[in-house]
């Protein structure tokens, strides 16, 4: 099980969802120097995207100064696959199970990244409107995407309100990432439930 680390300090609403997912993938498969040797073909297969989509996303990341592309050549001067270096930026560092992250839809990945950038080591409270503005999508989309992340067991979401603060009970969500031990416990419980359903009475 690989872990996904991200250290980003940018407003991801300026990036397309596919660019965010490609950036996360390159980070997860980079060495200690931040360099990824994955070829375009292998990356497209892993992410389930076309080569033209890959090219557009990579072009967006290079223009934003987040990824540097360096050509490689063999001893005969023939070009090999490029290397991709993720430029380190200041920001929060967070971790998630890469197996889970790779399965996220592009838009789920964008919302997940925005939440994780803010969540830090504890929890983070935000209104649906604020999260929608940060991600550049509608409040309805945020509700649907957050529910999907919650149902996949990636986020712990708790609805709260500020009625005690005298602001007419404005509602907001508090997000907390599951720790590895909690994820393991949740998966064990799920397996036990599935096993009990398959056991004849």
Give short role names for the model-derived ranges:
Residues 1-201:
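Electropositive, intrinsically flexible nucleic-acid-contacting patches
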């Amino acid at each position: 099980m690989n872990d996904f680390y991200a250290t980003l300090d940018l407003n991801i609403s300026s990036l397309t969802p596919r660019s965010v997912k490609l950036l996360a993938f390159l980070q997860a498969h980079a060495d200690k120097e931040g360099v990824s040797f994955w070829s375009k073909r292998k990356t497209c297969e892993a992410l389930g995207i076309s080569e033209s989509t890959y090219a557009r996303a990579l072009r967006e990341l290079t223009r934003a100064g987040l990824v540097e592309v360096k050509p490689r050549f063999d001893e005969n001067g023939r070009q090999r696959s490029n290397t991709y270096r993720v430029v380190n930026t200041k920001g929060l560092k967070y971790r998630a199970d890469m197996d889970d992250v790779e399965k996220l839809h592009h838009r789920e990945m964008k919302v997940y990244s925005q939440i994780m950038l803010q969540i830090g080591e504890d929890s983070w409270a935000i209104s649906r409107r604020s999260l929608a503005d940060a991600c550049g999508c509608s409040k309805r989309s945020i509700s649907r995407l957050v529910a999907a992340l919650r149902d996949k067991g990636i986020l712990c979401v708790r609805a709260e309100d500020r009625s005690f603060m005298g602001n007419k009970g404005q509602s907001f969500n508090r997000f907390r990432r599951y720790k590895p031990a909690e994820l393991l416990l949740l998966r064990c419980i799920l397996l036990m439930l599935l096993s009990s359903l398959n056991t004849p009475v």
